Amino acid sequence: MKRRTVLSMEQALSMPYATLRFAQLGWRVIRLESTPSRGGLPGDPNRYIGANVVDDDRRTYFIAPNVGKEAIAINLKEPDGQALLRRLLVELDVDVFCCNTVPRRYEQLGIDYETLSRTKPDLIWAGISAMGPDYPDAPGYDPVLQAMAGYMELTGDADGPPTLAGVPIVDLKAGDEVFANVMLALLERAETGKGSRIDVSMLQAAASWLITTLPLLDFDCQPAEITRCGNAHRKFIPTNVYPTADGFIYMAIGSDVQWRRLTEIPKFASLGAAPRATNEGRHKERDAIHRDMAAVTTRFATAEIAADFRDATIPHAPIHDIPAVRDMEAVRRRLTTTRTPDGRLVHMQPMAVDVAGASGELAFPAKYGQDTCAVLREAGYADEAIAQLRERGIVAG
């Protein structure tokens, strides 16, 4: 695919994750941050979260989503800053403009689709917000959206409190939707020559994943079917985490055939009473089955139980911690990497899908405003003009 140019006014995680996926393809990604405000740290607040890696504005939490990107700083509160942005769109032949600020700021900052598309009609514009442009003031924080979209209601023990997922899934889902819909927009542009606007509502994107619960409301479901149930599956029995002599193991029975194979394992033969032969029958005895399963698994090491399940083709997995996940051969050989300015190799998460020709190593994140001067020169600004813009607070870096 042709290398594209993405200019992204981004912060936090949702949009940086989307543009990371473009950077992983070898596209040019320029992250646009604000100029310093009175009394505040400059740029994306995430720059200053976590342990110091090489300097104060490139800390651990900021690194992985922002590798492979350039960084510029423009004051979009000023008309001259907005004019500068529009010039960059043309001079750099920007394909995609992204932002993840609250929609009420679009026109205030001159980044709304109508304004930018008048400057560059073939521009693809993508914005992430909490609930879309109809709710212009709603803040889009992942934990808030997990609560709002019912995810916390569905996560945790049945008799425990609502629980946050261990991964910022709404942020990442929103970023994936930007990635996918930009690709669709590029295909459409190739046919029509026209740009388009993409609005990703984090709430709508999150609700689209409620495919196993939300539709049940029109089928007179029981309350237990649409609330949290710990590690158990609401429909398939037994599917759960069980204790072993040295840890835990997860196993899933998804059919009556798999149940029969389970009860043919000598250790589990005592569970195979006739009423349990069907999933419907097992559902009626689910609490007893979970107790019976745990009574067996707790007597044996995880590796021994896993070997039995593997021989019987029962879906299962140990409960890995994050170091163990990274050490899995299927993951380890696909890890992306970056290098700190002093040459230290840093291993990061793999790409979602292997892409032929994609580089596994991406440049270390740029310092705040590191590329402002170079990008402005590329857009035709002389050094004297750049210095004047800096003195007036229109740019930084």
UniProtKB/Swiss-Prot annotation:
UniProt cross-references to InterPro entries, sorted A to Z: CoA-transferase_III_domain, CoA-Trfase_fam_III, CoA-Trfase_III_dom3_sf, CoA-Trfase_III_dom_1_sf
UniProt keyword Transferase present: yes
Gene3D superfamilies from the UniProt entry: Crotonobetainyl-coa:carnitine coa-transferase, domain 1 (3.40.50.10540), formyl-coa transferase, domain 3 (3.30.1540.10)
Catalytic residues, chain numbering: D171
Protein's UniProt keywords contain Transmembrane helix: no
Reaction(s) the record says it catalyses: phenylsuccinate + succinyl-CoA = 2-phenylsuccinyl-CoA + succinate; phenylsuccinate + succinyl-CoA = 3-phenylsuccinyl-CoA + succinate; (S)-2-benzylsuccinate + succinyl-CoA = (S)-2-benzylsuccinyl-CoA + succinate; (R)-2-benzylsuccinate + succinyl-CoA = (R)-2-benzylsuccinyl-CoA + succinate
Keywords tagged on the record: Transferase
The protein's Enzyme Commission number: 2.8.3.28
Molecular function terms, GO-annotated: CoA-transferase activity
Family note: Belongs to the CoA-transferase III family.
Role: Involved in degradation of indoleacetate, the most common member of the auxin class of plant hormones. CoA-transferase that catalyzes the succinyl-CoA-dependent activation of phenylsuccinate to phenylsuccinyl-CoA. Acts as a rather unspecific CoA-transferase that shows a broad substrate specificity for C4-dicarboxylic acids, including succinate, (R/S)-phenylsuccinate, (S)- and (R)-benzylsuccinate and their CoA-thioesters, indicating a fully reversible catalytic process.
Subunit structure, as described in the record: Homodimer or homotetramer.
Stated name of the protein: Phenylsuccinyl-CoA transferase
Species of origin: Aromatoleum aromaticum (strain DSM 19018 / LMG 30748 / EbN1) (Azoarcus sp. (strain EbN1))
Lineage: Bacteria, Pseudomonadati, Pseudomonadota, Betaproteobacteria, Rhodocyclales
Gene name per UniProt: iaaL
